[in-house]
Amino acid sequence: MLNARFLVPRLLCLQGRTTSYSTAAALPNPIPNPEIRYNQLFINNEWHDAVSKKTFPTVNPTTGEVIGHVAEGDRADVDLAVRAAREAFRLGSPWRRMDASERGRLLNRLADLVERDRVYLASLETLDNGKPFQESYVLDLDEVIKVYRYLAGWADKWHGKTIPMDGEHFCFTRHEPVGVCGQIIPWNFPLVMQGWKLAPALATGNTVVMKVAEQTPLSALYLASLIKEAGFPPGVVNIITGYGPTAGAAIAQHMDVDKVAFTGSTEVGHLIQKAAGDSNLKRVTLELGGKSPSIVLADADMDHAVDQCHEALFFNMGQCCCAGSRTFVEESIYHEFLERTVEKAKKRKVGNPFELDTQQGPQVDKEQFEKILGYIRLGQKEGAKLLCGGERFGERGFFIKPTVFGNVQDDMRIAREEIFGPVQPLFKFKKIEEVIQRANNTRYGLAAAVFTRDLDKALYFSQALQAGTVWVNTYNIVTCHTPFGGFKESGNGRELGEDGLKAYTEVKTVTIKVSEKNS
């Protein structure tokens, strides 16, 4: 049932994105209390309790109340899942003998099922994660559907080539699947991150053991049921719920896992890289933290820059690895920009994420909530000027008022460390070379943005900024068509786009002796 009061254009403008929805389309009503249908481990296309029989609670961040309990997988369960994935990857198995085009058909079928259950999945995501329903439905689910369809199209187009070589030989290359892929996904975009990991792995013929975030397991488990319904053979996809130090570590350390892909904090990324090296030198893809700069030059469109820098930070409650968490503004426009930024932050609607006009929901859990408030206190202690927000919103749940700091110095911890919350620090700069040096003076390098009307300056910044993605006069434009990943301690490897397929295949060279070679 559609609610015609709340139209899509505001949300599309929020991210500068276009979706398959007409701007005249109304949002459907959410399901405020979606039924929890799955809470067990998904191994070999079957549902299982944890070997230990342990469970853990998943909490509604809007209220702080327990939604339900989910199986707590650990090393023993990971072993079972890896065994199932290895059997599914066995030479001559149904999955290995399946045509690449058929793998693409299965991924398209999965996209169809996600589209069919879009309202339910978006509602489940909002319940477990706390993000506004309109963002779950319009942005996240749109990206999920597109990533499965996009990678489905690549399934029979990612291939080797013939190579002319000297002598009486014929040579060609094969792009072969890596094998059993361990995947560990975060809680900030559960379904999106699941799609980013699963789609390229399956398109290229791998099998998967995925550990989902303990804060947000529900939507990933429901999607597991759709994987079975779509027709993927047993063992191709296995979903484990559990904690990072147990289930996640077991995947990273496992001697029969050929590759691990992780999205999360830089600190955990270091541990996973080390575990991979200490075990079987499994291939590693890491998409980690960020402290991304948004740079506003004096010639920028002021209204547009204020809007974009606001959403660059506050989108998804600030819980975004590529959030624009350092806003540098040229000195001549700094005070006007600051005033407009504070005004916009004060107007941001915080509240129940199931209400269709809500712009900001709660932080994902109590730990994250308290960590962010701690950084706000630290910023004040270090001498930054608190201009708005800085405290909890409401009496229950994990809500924080949109917070803006001025007078922030580069050596402050709120300027150097990833806060991962609705806290926007503003900085002043005078010269282009100065701001480039300051923007790059971080251990991170995930993303950056520049706002200017001068094309020469925009191109210069795009070359000078040390980041995997540079946006010009926009922010947070991430789609399945383009590679995404970081420089420095923001990770290694790329996800999405054609480049993202490389991480899931090995290139094999086959050379054949021939009796006579002709051109």
Swiss-Prot record:
Q: Which Pfam families match?
A: Aldedh (PF00171)
Which PROSITE patterns does the UniProt entry name for this protein?
A: ALDEHYDE_DEHYDR_CYS, ALDEHYDE_DEHYDR_GLU
Reactions catalysed, semicolon-separated, are: an aldehyde + NAD(+) + H2O = a carboxylate + NADH + 2 H(+)
Q: Where is the transit peptide?
A: 1-19
Choose any GO biological process term that the UniProt entry carries and state it.
ethanol catabolic process
Give all N6-acetyllysine modified positions. Answer: 53-54, 366, 385, 401, 428, 431
Q: Which GO terms describe its cellular component?
A: mitochondrial matrix
Q: Which UniProt keywords apply?
A: Acetylation, Mitochondrion, NAD, Oxidoreductase, Transit peptide
- Locate the residues binding NAD(+): 264-269
Q: Which InterPro entries match?
A: Ald_DH/histidinol_DH, Ald_DH_C, Ald_DH_CS_CYS, Ald_DH_CS_GLU, Ald_DH_N, Aldehyde_DH_dom
N6-succinyllysine PTM sites in chain numbering: 54, 366, 385, 401, 428
> Which pathway does UniProt place it in?
Alcohol metabolism; ethanol degradation; acetate from ethanol: step 2/2
Enzyme Commission identifier(s) = 1.2.1.3
Q: State a single Gene Ontology molecular function.
A: aldehyde dehydrogenase (NAD+) activity
Q: Which family does it belong to?
A: Belongs to the aldehyde dehydrogenase family.
Q: What does this protein do?
A: ALDHs play a major role in the detoxification of alcohol-derived acetaldehyde. They are involved in the metabolism of corticosteroids, biogenic amines, neurotransmitters, and lipid peroxidation.
Q: How does it assemble?
A: Homotetramer.
Q: What is this protein called?
A: Aldehyde dehydrogenase X, mitochondrial
Biological source species: Rattus norvegicus (Rat)
The taxonomy runs: Eukaryota, Metazoa, Chordata, Craniata, Vertebrata
